[in-house]
């Protein structure tokens, strides 16, 4: 299964059509025979040939996804002075205003233009006594939460946990896609980091 995506370029009147793979997680989650191997092959193709994919039957409630997007809309609708109270600083995650960062991702093509996007980066917060927090490591928190948006923190944390659980559930597929045992990555995910 795939989704047709039409992209119109500014440099020509041509329309490019690419197929974005859609991976159905349902049979894998149901434990159907051969589902893991089939899905791992589809995942490998998607990652090697396309670079990204959609998933269906992932188990994350659509209501939660909608609520998460709704909360993000609320925070981005705040006045700039309120958003700047959440600003990422040093190792602290948080709000990154537009035109404040230049991303250089290639030694060949050195980008000098500021990124136009505004971003809200949050991480899975660690307890105060976590070694990463004590050492002041990046991506260990704490997150700066808006004070004037009731329910924001709870909804975003609920989204984080649901998506992290999904990532953990599909981790064996990545191992199988690389011709490794399904539990190959398990030792590396005893204290995982994530950022959104």
Where are these regions (language model features)?
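Peripheral, non-catalytic segments flanking oxidoreductase cores
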Residues: 1-196
């Amino acid at each position: 299964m795939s989704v047709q995506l039409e992209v119109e370029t500014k440099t020509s009147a041509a329309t490019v059509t690419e197929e974005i793979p859609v991976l159905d997680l349902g049979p894998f989650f149901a434990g159907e025979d051969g589902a893991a191997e089939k899905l791992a092959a589809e995942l490998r193709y998607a990652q090697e040939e396309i670079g990204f994919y959609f998933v269906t039957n992932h188990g994350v409630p659509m209501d939660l996804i909608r609520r998460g997007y709704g909360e993000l809309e609320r925070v981005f609708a705040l006045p700039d002075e309120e958003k700047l109270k959440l600003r990422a600083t040093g190792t602290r995650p948080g709000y990154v205003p537009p035109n404040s960062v230049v991303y250089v991702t290639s030694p060949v093509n050195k980008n000098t233009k500021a990124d136009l996007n505004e971003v809200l980066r949050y991480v899975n917060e660690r307890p105060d006594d976590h070694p990463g927090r004590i050492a002041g490591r990046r991506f260990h928190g704490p997150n700066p939460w808006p004070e004037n948006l009731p329910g924001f923190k709870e909804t975003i944390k609920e989204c984080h946990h649901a998506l992290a659980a999904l990532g953990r559930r599909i981790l064996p597929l990545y191992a199988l896609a690389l011709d490794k045992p399904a539990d190959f990555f398990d030792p590396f995910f005893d204290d995982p980091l994530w950022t959104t």
